[in-house]
Amino acid sequence: ARCDGSSLLIDCGEGTQEALKEKGWSPKPIDVICFTHYHADHISGLPGLLLTMGNAERTEPVTLIGPKGLERVVNALRTIAPELPFQLKFIELEENRHQFHIGPYVIDAYRVNHNVACYGYSISIPRAGRFDVERAKAQNVPMKAWSRLQKGETLELDGVTYTPDMVLGPDRKGLKVTYCTDTRPVPVIAEYAEHADL
């Protein structure tokens, strides 16, 4: 997924960099990598990807999400990529369901049925409501604040606090992608796939 200059990747097999190259996408803006499980075809491309991101002068932290044991598995793989110019943040999943808000993404992780700990993911990108000029005028919101409020910022002008909900209409339908792999059929998949765009 890509949104507002940020990218999210699910799994990182050995062909990941080639697939990114074919799409013309740089790995540098990948801020989040979600792992379904730790079989080699889902994680063996990580050391090379991290090195490529470092060589592209990335300095911002990268968040890694996956089943319990993530940090141990990644550190074992990093013996060939020990020095990185950015921090790795680890989120290890232990419960059956988790939800995270990272950057523009709402990430739902849910346990599926594989022969090792394995999770599926639903990635949602919420979409704010449209700017409502009449609503802004009715609440005496200064025009100089409109642009920042429309971008989701809260601000204070002349001792008055203005919030985005003062000028935005109801939330619009965002985008939802649900992904699961290597699992036996379980009801939770249909639950998270409901209303997904993909």
PLM features: residue spans?
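A gly/proline- and charged-residue-enriched helix-loop-helix capping module
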Residues: R72-T79, F90-E95
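Alpha-helical elements of the RecA-like P-loop NTPase motor core of helicases
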Residues: E18, S44-P47, R72-N75, Y119, ...
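Conserved beta-strand hairpin/beta-sheet module of binuclear metal-dependent hydrolase folds
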Residues: A1-W25, P61, Y121-I123, P170-C180, ...
